């Protein structure tokens, strides 16, 4: 089941979002090795970018922004925003590869 980040991203912002896998890792007595967020093609076409990303002890943190050329696009003016499905994959020391999709809304605030 996809998750959703509660706070939308304004196209003018550089903003961090995180996802935590602590419950899954604890249940399997495993530890995180890598964390990777990926952008789908529709997000890339709209100008969404990953500025940086990093792994934490139990998940990942990603910073999103919109490239300067697309920040003033009228696509962001929809009052409900534009929603993108962002995959987040981790690998563990136990050899597991886990993935979840998280919805990110981009809209003018």
Which sequence ranges carry the predicted segments?
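C-terminal edge beta-strand
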Residues: 96-107
